[in-house]
Every structure is written in structure tokens, then in C-alpha cells.
Design a protein with these regions (language model features):
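Short beta-strand-to-loop acidic/aromatic patch adjacent to the donor-nucleotide binding site
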Residues: 91-102
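Cell-envelope/extracellular polymer assembly enzymes that use nucleotide-activated donors
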Residues: 3-5, 40
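A conserved acidic beta->alpha catalytic loop
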Residues: 45-54, 101-102
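Acceptor/aglycone-binding surface of glycosyltransferases and processive sugar-polymer synthases
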Residues: 71-87, 102-184, 201-220
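Short, well-formed alpha-helical segments that are part of the catalytic scaffolds
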Residues: 13-32
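Acidic helix N-cap motif at the loop->helix transition within catalytic regions
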Residues: 15-19, 50-59
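Conserved donor nucleotide-binding strand/loop of the catalytic core
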Residues: 32, 39-42, 53-82, 86-87
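Hydrophobic helical membrane-anchoring modules
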Residues: 1-3, 181-298
Length: 298
């Protein structure tokens, strides 16, 4: 019997973890779409401050299909989820099913169906999002910027709610990033992928733990994890600034030869030196970044 592993991160989700557990268990019950598959449900608690950990312990004691990872502190959503991913033993793995059930578990049987037909990555796409206009706009800007800078495409509104084959899982967990951007890692593997649209639901219980600063942090991590364009742009701008500073120095010398009183003594030299050395510093910062990137890639 094939096994399906499902990863559910949680942080202060005492109102949702039991509902998440039951929703997944119902998919594998007799007569349900996944009755012929073995279930492995891994909860990763990110040092919750409420009774989430207590509830998860009780679920694990009563159901051998449930595994629980209790983090010693809050490591953030990406690191916590990636750590839990390492413990998956299934033939296919649902990378991210958050306990708040905004990503609907009822989509998983269709994901499994496509996987059985040879698709190695079934990526859920949030075709409809029950969220504010500001958040939608922010996400749209992020995806367009990220895709314009990276060497591969992450479809807009595709998150970590994806089902991946075991061989994709092996490639993904081989990454040793300190702060892994999971959807980017999966997209970079290049395996056969299918996009599956679904409606991302509004949260029914509790409040979201993702504030504006957390979203910005995740966006910056996504942008800088898979592209060297900002570093090269830094070098390019540095050389450009230094070049124009040099031209200005030549222009200043020529003007001084014709009219020594064109500006107070030393002003042109100071302006030229400031811009020239600022440009040189910026260029070498970019070059240093290129070397660090090369070391990281090795």
C-alpha cells in the first residue's frame, strides 16, 4: 500500500489542529477517495504558547498515523516546515497543509490522482483568494519581481501547498539552506509539474500569524535565494558611478584650465573623489557578493 505523507505546520492553532487532523483522516477513511492509501500526518508545532502542543500529543497517542514535532523555539514557518519535511516517509508528500485549513484538504485526492498519472509535482494555485486587495497587490508585485530576476518561474499564487513525488522529495531535502524558500526549491528542481487551481479560503477560527513584516521577510528571502541579479546590479551601478565621476574629473580639469575661478578651490576635487570612491566601493561590494554566492553554490 502506498503511503501519502502530509505536513501541517502550526503555531498557536489550538482552535484548528483537531479540525485539520479530522479533515485529513476523513480522506483516508473507508469509502473515502484515499481509502487505499496509508496516511502519515506530520504536525510541526513552532513553539506554540497555547495548548496546541498538548492537543497534538493527545492526537499522536491515539493515532499511530500521526507524528508530532515540537520545536524548542519559534524557528519561523520555512525552517519549521522544512525540518518536518525531512521526517516524511511517504511515496508522495504534501509539502504544506497549514492547520488553519485555508488550503483545502479536499484538493489532495485530485493531487494524488495526477501523481498516479505520472506527474511528479502537483502545485496548488490559489486561483481565488479570500483576502484584502492590499495583500493581493503585494503578492502580485512579489511574484512578478521574483520571476523577472530568477532563472526559473514560480507561477503567481503558487505556494507550498504542493504534492511531490519521493524522488523530488529527495532532491528538495538535500538542500542545506539556513532559511529555505521551499516553493523556490521545488520549482528549481525541474521535475514534471502540473498546476492545480483551487480556492484559498478565509480563516474560520483564530487569527493569522503572518503580519506585514513577516510577509516582507518571506518575500525578500524568496527574491534573494535564487538570483544574483541584485549583486550584479550593485557592481554595474558602482562601475557606472565611478565612470561618470572620472568623466566629471576630466571635465573639471579642462574647465579649470580655462577659468580657474569657475568654482571655489577644492570643491570639484571633493565632489569627484566622493562619487568616484563611492562607485568603486559599490562595485567591489558586488564583486565580493559574487564570490560569496559562488562559495554558497559549491
Amino acid at each position: 500500500m502506498k503511503r501519502i505523507s502530509i505536513i501541517s505546520p502550526a503555531y498557536n492553532e489550538e482552535d484548528n489542529v483537531e479540525a485539520c487532523y479530522q479533515a485529513v483522516a476523513d480522506l483516508f477513511a473507508p469509502g473515502a477517495p484515499l481509502e487505499h492509501y496509508e496516511r502519515e500526518h506530520i504536525f510541526a508545532d513552532n513553539a506554540s504558547e497555547d495548548s496546541t502542543a498538548t492537543i497534538l500529543r493527545r492526537l499522536a497517542e491515539s493515532d499511530p498515523c500521526v507524528k508530532v514535532i515540537l520545536n524548542a523555539r519559534n524557528f519561523g514557518p520555512f525552517r519549521s516546515n522544512f525540518n518536518a519535511l525531512r521526517y516524511a516517509t511517504g511515496d508522495a508528500v504534501v509539502v504544506f497543509l497549514p492547520a488553519d485549513l485555508q488550503d483545502p484538504p479536499e484538493v489532495i485526492p485530485e493531487m494524488v490522482k495526477h501523481w498516479e498519472n505520472g506527474i511528479e509535482v502537483v502545485a496548488g494555485l490559489r486561483a481565488n483568494r479570500e483576502e484584502t486587495l492590499m495583500l493581493r497587490t503585494f503578492r502580485r508585485i512579489f511574484y512578478r519581481l521574483s520571476n523577472s530576476l530568477s532563472n526559473f518561474e514560480i507561477p503567481e499564487n503558487v505556494g507550498e501547498f504542493q504534492l511531490i513525488d519521493r524522488k523530488v522529495w529527495e532532491v528538495v531535502i538535500s538542500h542545506t539552506d539556513h532559511y529555505p524558500y521551499i516553493r523556490g526549491i521545488i520549482a528549481s528542481t525541474g521535475f514534471k509539474r502540473l498546476i492545480l487551481p483551487y480556492t484559498w479560503k478565509a480563516r474560520k477560527r483564530g487569527i493569522s500569524k503572518n503580519n506585514a513584516l513577516a510577509l516582507i521577510d518571506q518575500a525578500l528571502n524568496g527574491i534573494f535565494s535564487f538570483t544574483t541579479v541584485p549583486l550584479r546590479l550593485c557592481s554595474f551601478l558602482g562601475f557606472i558611478i565611478a565612470f561618470f565621476a572620472f568623466l566629471y574629473a576630466v571635465f573639471t580639469i579642462i574647465m579649470t584650465l580655462f577659468d580657474a575661478s569657475a568654482a571655489p578651490a577644492g570643491i570639484q576635487t571633493m565632489i569627484t573623489a566622493i562619487f568616484f570612491f563611492a562607485g568603486v566601493q559599490l562595485a567591489f561590494i558586488g564583486l565580493l557578493g559574487e564570490y560569496v554566492t559562488a562559495i554558497h553554490a559549491q
